């Protein structure tokens, strides 16, 4: 039903008017300031965070301190879900969630060292660039029409990034691997691009694969009707 309504009126979640107009942007303003990007009302309008009638859109809600979505991280003892080691949930602006979730994942991303001659070379269990891209893709491209959280499952032998919502209609995994881009949340994608969090549309999956080009084990991508899982 949601999909039918969306196809009928052509308004995606991030472009729709937000029901909550009492929003604050403390964290987001700090990020914009750090990146030397203006965040005045005129800039918010040009970014689509304020509509033509002066109301906040859902894109503004996602960037606000009142964001209703979250990221849930779970750390398990081994390669199964039988026993938790730790759990943490991240709230607030999706920019805040990304920062805090990335920091948390890195605490579980063990650093190892090898030597090439006299030089020490540090390696992580998982390339930090791949972790960053998988996390950003999950946040930027998930389906925010659904209230469920992004799930990050950290096992002893792998990390799973579970994003709500499959691929945009008409796009296949082959298309994504080839760099075809059709952002579900164009306003959010543009904000992340302006903040230099993503470099360009359609390159995230390719960059994840490139970061593993010298490794035996490669990332996998599993797509369901309502989920996208990167392992």
How should each PLM-predicted stretch be described?
Residues 226-231:
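Conserved alpha/beta core segments of nucleic-acid transaction machinery
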Residues 161:
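Pre-DFG segment of protein kinase catalytic domains
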Residues 153-155, 223-224:
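A structural signal for short secondary-structure junctions
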Residues 181-211:
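Glycine-rich phosphate-binding loop
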Residues 1-147, 154-157, 165-183, 204, ...:
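Active-site helix-to-loop segments that bind/position phosphate- or nucleotide-bearing substrates
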Residues 216-222:
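Glycine-rich ATP-binding loops of the HATPase_c
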């Amino acid at each position: 039903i949601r999909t039918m309504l969306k196809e009928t009126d052509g308004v995606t979640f991030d472009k729709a008017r937000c029901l909550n107009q009492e929003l604050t942007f403390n964290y987001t303003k700090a990020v914009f300031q750090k990146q030397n990007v203006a965040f005045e009302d005129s800039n918010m309008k040009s970014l689509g965070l304020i509509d033509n009638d002066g109301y906040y859109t859902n894109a503004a809600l996602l960037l606000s301190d009142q964001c209703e979505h979250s990221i849930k991280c779970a750390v398990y003892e081994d390669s199964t879900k039988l026993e938790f080691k730790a759990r943490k949930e991240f709230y607030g602006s999706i920019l805040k969630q990304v920062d805090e979730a990335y920091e948390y994942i890195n605490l579980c991303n063990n650093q190892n060292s090898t030597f090439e001659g006299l030089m020490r070379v540090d390696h992580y269990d998982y390339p930090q660039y791949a972790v960053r891209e998988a996390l950003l893709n999950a946040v930027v491209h998930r389906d925010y029409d659904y209230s469920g959280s992004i799930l990050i499952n950290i096992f002893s032998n792998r990390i799973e990034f579970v994003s709500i919502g499959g691929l945009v209609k008409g796009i296949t995994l082959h298309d994504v691997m080839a760099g075809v881009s059709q952002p579900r949340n164009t306003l959010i994608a543009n904000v992340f691009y302006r903040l230099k969090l993503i470099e360009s549309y359609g390159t995230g999956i390719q960059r994840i694969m490139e970061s593993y080009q010298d490794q035996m084990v490669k990332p996998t991508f599993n797509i369901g009707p309502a989920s996208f899982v990167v392992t």
